[in-house]
Amino acid sequence: MPSSNNKDNFLDKAFTVIAEGIVKMMPIAAKEKQAYIYYREGFAAQNNGDYSEALENYEESLKLEENPVDRGETLKNMAIIYMSNGDEDRALETYVKALDQNPKQPSCLKNMGLIYEKRGRSAQQRGLQDESDIWFDKAADVWTKAVRLYPGGYLDIENWLKTTGRSKIDVYL
């Protein structure tokens, strides 16, 4: 019986073949097709944990991609990598760029809030209550926006907003 890993590998390869066929048939310019290919390669590398290769492919995709929604998605994935690598400042900058391209990405706002909330907890542990409140307020601001974009999708965040008294909205749905 094949292992789960073999099944996943087969599915990845099958998806890649199908996606390549679709891209070839799509009635779009060669530049846009190449941008998508770089994006897809970056996404595959990211899923395999090869973050440097993923970032290289995402950078190439951004050079070619003109669609703001697609650019926003690429930037969001880059920010996730920066966040995973512990480069929170760069992640925040990149999330802002992603939102500039496509403001309807609640996951960007959610992840920005995670960074702010983490910084708030850190300041709180060091006894810096004023600084902690600033970070928690920033988290509340972006999380409120995320909840408005994706009602019911972030129940843990809705609960945090309510229990900390930072909820700016009465009804989330």
UniProtKB/Swiss-Prot annotation:
Keywords for this protein: Membrane, Photosynthesis, Repeat, Thylakoid, TPR repeat
TPR repeats mapped onto the chain: 35-68, 72-105, 120-153
Superkingdom per UniProt: Bacteria
PROSITE patterns: TPR (PS50005), TPR_REGION (PS50293)
Chain segments annotated as transmembrane: none
GO biological process per UniProt: photosynthesis
Coiled coil (UniProt feature): none
A single Gene Ontology CC term: plasma membrane-derived thylakoid membrane
Membrane topology: Peripheral membrane protein
Subcellular location: Cellular thylakoid membrane
Gene3D superfamilies associated with the record: Tetratricopeptide repeat domain
Role: Essential for the assembly of the photosystem I (PSI) complex. May act as a chaperone-like factor to guide the assembly of the PSI subunits.
Family named by the database record: Belongs to the Ycf3 family.
Protein name as annotated: Photosystem I assembly protein Ycf3
Taxon lineage: Bacteria, Bacillati, Cyanobacteriota, Cyanophyceae, Synechococcales
